[in-house]
Structures are given as C-alpha cells and as structure tokens.
Amino acid sequence: MFKKPDVNSYFYFTYGQIHKPALLGIFGAVLGYAGYNQMDKKSVYPEYYDKLQNIKVSIVPNAANGYFSKKMTYFNNSTGFASHEQGGNLIVKEQWLEEPSWDIYVLIDNKEAEKIAEFISERKSVYLPYLGKNDHTADITNVTLEEGTVQSRAAKIQCLFIRDKAEIDKDSVMFLYETELFKYEEALPIGLKPETNQYLLTKMVYTNMNLVNIKDEVWRAGNRDIVFY
C-alpha cells in the first residue's frame, strides 16, 4: 500500500503503482540509511533520500494492462489520538493493491547505485524493506545484473514513463486493430519537495502503443526497451 496524502480520518487510499520515493525508501532500508524519524531540524531531506535522490530507476508493472486490483480492508485504531478519546475505537478503511508485482531496474552509474546492486545481489539488508507500511514486507527476488545498451531508435517504451517525455503515435494506432491496446495513466510521486518533503507528482504512462517524439534515452535491457528517471 502506497498511501496517498489526500486522505481523511476514515479512508486511506493507495497509489496504483510503486513510485520512485517508495523505491528509494526500500533501497534506504536495505543500505541502513536513516528515515524521517531520525531527521534533525537542519536537514532538508531524510538521510535515505538525500543520498539516493539521484538514483535512476525504471518500473515495469507485472499486471494486465498495468492495472492492479484494489480492495478495501477494515481495521480498528484504538489509540486515543486516533479516536479523540482515551479508550475509544476508530474503524479505518484502508485500500490495498492485490498481489502487486513489478520488475525494477536500477541504472548503475554512481557509487550509491553500486551499493544497491551489491546488497541486493548478495541478499543483504540492514533493515527490513516493506511496501508502503511495515506489515507489507517487500519480497525481492530474481535479481540479475544486465548489460544495457542505449537504442538509437525505439518505437515503444515498455515501462512507466513521464507523460511529457513521449507521445502516442496516433497514425500507427489504426493499423493495430488486431492488438488489444491499453494505456495506463496516473499522477505518481517522482520526488520530494525540499521545502516540505511532500510528494512531487507528475503524470506517468504505461502503454503498449507505439510512441513518437521520445525525449529520454531508451535502453535495451534483456528483451525490453525502457527509460530511467
């Protein structure tokens, strides 16, 4: 569950995908970097984000058309702070993703990225990584190191990408009538604002349609063409 900040006391909603700040939090836990609770007043960012914000990632949803099913889960919050009175009980509805799975790529182009590759390849972790909250443990499997190559030309991006960095090739869509086309789009966090540490959002897209005017470098990794951000 990757909780959206725009919630009330009774409903907690999730983003539809893991996002870059959440990924950096996982990597920070693996490497043992401090989080929000350890920040001092002089710090602009928590230690994990300060050290890892320049890491480049690529995210591929392992879901039909990019969409994971969501379900509402109910639980009791019996703290006095939550229910506004000692001994009170507040029933909270929380939205979860069902069986989420992603292929995550990290561009190894600096020392912190090299540390991430070393720790994850050797299955080392200082703290337990989790998906959004600590009762959803992150299961990191099938770790490989791959040689990637930058493509001089590409017609598709097979991962989430920033919407403003490419355009749907509308001319090609009419010739793909035998293919089930899809387009997933959502405003997702890509960073933190230095003034408040709140999420910096941008529109992200995942599609099997052909693209034009691709502004990012497209990497071939295995059998996929992906971009990093």
Label the predicted regions.
Residues 1-5:
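Short N-terminal binding/cap micro-motifs at the start of the first secondary-structure element
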